[in-house]
Amino acid sequence: LKNFLKKNQKKIIKELDIFYSKYSKNKIITITGTNGKSTTAKLLDLILKDHKKDSRLCGNIGNPILSQKKISKNTLFVVEASSYQIAYSKFFKTNYAVILNISPDHLERHGSIENYVSAKFKLITNQSKKDFAFLNSKDRYLKNKIKKSKFFSRLINVNPKLTNSFNKKVVNPYFLSQGNRENLSFIFSISKKLKLKENKILKIINKFKGLKYRQQIIYNSNKITLINDSKATTFASTMNILKVLKKVYWLVGGIGKLGDKFTLKKNECKNIKAYVFGKNKNFFIKKFKNKISYYCFKDLNTALKQVLKEINNSRDNLHRTVLFSPAAASFDSFKNFEERGKHFNFLLKKY
């Protein structure tokens, strides 16, 4: 079967192509990027629904793209697309292409960072003159790709920093990290192009509870905050939140990603203690390069037990944060990041 599929690769049509063949006349907004795809797609879908739009959230977020029902000419689709889905598609096109960010990921599958960027950028090269592409042109990986590529869509450069007026109006603690704030910049940019109302956008943003296992606040008190960020499978997805937290007990471990780098400076790590668990501890220790205090444990259970013991024994009144953000794939011990996230919540209840 493997040889047959390889030999007939060009004849195989993927789900994005079948979807496009059915709904090419509908408006399609496709969101990709290394981090923040699901959160951004979900938030945009909620905003559109609040504007009484017949919005359908589908794709890699878990709602099968081909199982949508009762579609009318006014239906618009918010599609979360992975690099694999885009790379293997043949003629899929989107009216609005959104590339949130790029950092090294899935290089085992794509072979190189260049191939990975090309897979994402295919969303834009497949567009026509009537279409729009949203990206941060200062992104280190996209900058060169823009210069070297031929594309026809209208490029909208998104400033990753929110304007002061919007910053003051976003009071939801879920958007504390730099990464989540940058994703909001895309939300505002897309919403502006779609002529959506600012007051309604802000209402949804400030009510947004976040998605499971994505910087999800499990418990919060004056003494301690517990965050389940099991979805974090790279350093890039974890570092944004590490930068804004104080007195952090960071639970990290799993299968490290090829090409991944821990780029925080030593002075940015002074409030962080890393509790490294699992079989691949050396991967993380080498990446830390003595910039961070770390302790090693055989598994998540023993690491969490030690963290909670230290916090319970602390004599000061300083607020502490337990951050479960593995910065690695889960397949060494779990089926996927969801199972890993559920296990962490189970352990919290146990202790």
What are these regions (language model features)?
Residues 260-320:
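C-terminal helical cap/extension that packs against the catalytic core
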Residues 12, 31, 60, 100, ...:
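Residue-level signal for inorganic ion chemistry
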Residues 1-30, 51, 212-216, 300-311:
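Short, basic phosphate-binding NTP loop
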Residues 71-175, 332-338, 344:
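Flexible active-site lid/hinge loop adjacent to a nucleotide/diphosphate
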Residues 133-137, 251-253, 270-279:
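Short internal beta-strands
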Residues 53-65:
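Short beta-strand-centered segment that lines the nucleotide-binding/catalytic pocket of NTP-utilizing
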Residues 54, 173-271:
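Nucleotide phosphate-binding/pyrophosphate-handling subdomain across enzymes
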Residues 39-56:
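A conserved segment at the C-terminal end of the G1
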